[in-house]
């Protein structure tokens, strides 16, 4: 995963 995907996954984990 790259930085962009990492940020997307982080937001998804936050329930956004």
Swiss-Prot record:
Coiled coil: none annotated. Its main location: secreted. Keywords: Adaptive immunity, Blood coagulation, Coiled coil, Disulfide bond, Hemostasis, Immunity, Innate immunity, Secreted. Conversion of fibrinogen to fibrin is triggered by thrombin, which cleaves fibrinopeptides A and B from alpha and beta chains, and thus exposes the N-terminal polymerization sites responsible for the formation of the soft clot. The soft clot is converted into the hard clot by factor XIIIA which catalyzes the epsilon-(gamma-glutamyl)lysine cross-linking between gamma chains (stronger) and between alpha chains (weaker) of different monomers. Forms F13A-mediated cross-links between a glutamine and the epsilon-amino group of a lysine residue, forming fibronectin-fibrinogen heteropolymers. The keyword Coiled coil applies. GO terms for biological process: adaptive immune response; blood coagulation; innate immune response. It comes from the Eukaryota. It is found in: Secreted. GO terms for cellular component: extracellular region. Heterohexamer; disulfide linked. Contains 2 sets of 3 non-identical chains (alpha, beta and gamma). The 2 heterotrimers are in head to head conformation with the N-termini in a small central domain. Cleaved by the protease thrombin to yield monomers which, together with fibrinogen beta (FGB) and fibrinogen gamma (FGG), polymerize to form an insoluble fibrin matrix. Fibrin has a major function in hemostasis as one of the primary components of blood clots. In addition, functions during the early stages of wound repair to stabilize the lesion and guide cell migration during re-epithelialization. Was originally thought to be essential for platelet aggregation, based on in vitro studies using anticoagulated blood. A long coiled coil structure formed by 3 polypeptide chains connects the central nodule to the C-terminal domains (distal nodules). The long C-terminal ends of the alpha chains fold back, contributing a fourth strand to the coiled coil structure. This is Fibrinogen alpha chain. It comes from Neovison vison.
């Amino acid at each position: 995963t790259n930085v962009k995907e990492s940020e997307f996954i982080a937001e998804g984990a936050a329930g956004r």
